[in-house]
Amino acid sequence: MIDKSFWQGKRVFITGHTGFKGGWLSLWLSEMGATLKGYSLDAPTSPSLFDTASISSLMESEIGDIRDFEKLRNSIASFKPEIIFHMAAQPLVRLSYKEPIETYSTNVMGTVHLLEAVKQVGGIKAVVNITSDKCYENREWVWGYRENEAMGGYDPYSNSKGCAELVASAFRSSFFNPRDYANHGVGLASVRAGNVIGGGDWAEDRLIPDILRSFENNQQVVIRNPHSIRPWQHVLEPLSGYIVVAQNLYTDGAKYSEGWNFGPREEDAKTVEFIVDKMVTLWGEGASWLLDGQNHPHEAHYLKLDCSKAHMQLGWHPRWALVETLGRIVKWHKAWINGSDMLEYSKREIHDYMTTTTFS
């Protein structure tokens, strides 16, 4: 499990630190005493977690494009990190239909650039490559996908994440092979999570942010696909897994250099309709929703992960049930509306998670 003392003084480089997941990861690692540098485009939304929780006060922050190889390599070389989390991405399915070139250049070539920089700079012990559960070839069957399933992806976003996994696999085989770990000393793992939700997400075309925007403006929530099932989980759930993977890569890179799934309990893979109904109840007065009957680009209807390997080999398990998570999201958002100090509020959220010892 997470070892807070391990992170004290560790030099950690994070791409995509201005994003939703990147902001939460930066805050968590800072709380454990890590020395951080982030490399990313400006925060993708306004407002954003990065700004509302003052994440920039916790770390060195460089604004740069993952597609600019020279700038990225120089940024890494000047910081001399021990551990890298690669989160920078174009993360939206529907945007990938409109901007496929940007999606592939960011998600695929961005990964190539990051791993080539690691190879050239040297001195890095652990690289955690964050992709997505959508990297798998989705057969829309009832079983969870295991780490050795085929990569795929129907839409440009999902396919780009499958490609990013293949890039990581090729670099691992060619340059960071576990069998040759004694010579190169680099542990490289890929981590895959489902639909991550939590306070501080204002992205377009995501269910929870769309719901909260509508509630905040006293508008009905318009739902596209009420029967779609997603593996919903609080953002701290997979991040805790990524952190544990990094710890293990650092101490035994050869053993843990592979793919890892991080998803919720099976009973928390719920429909969109379940989510919006719960959110309506939690928000209270004035909240409601309606069905949008228009045609929309294809989105997979069912995809879940088999996380048995993470359970058995990492001791990782989810801590917060979906209903607990939804309640925390509403409270976080209302605290922001009411002008609370969201850095301190978010620190307390992490503390609550760290001190949850049984599933709640």
Q: What is the predicted role of each segment?
A:
Residues 31-38, 64, 195, 215-360:
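C-terminal substrate-binding subdomain of Rossmann-fold SDR/epimerase-dehydratase oxidoreductases
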Residues 67, 92, 103, 198, ...:
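Glycine-/small-residue-rich active-site loops that bind phosphorylated ligands and cofactors
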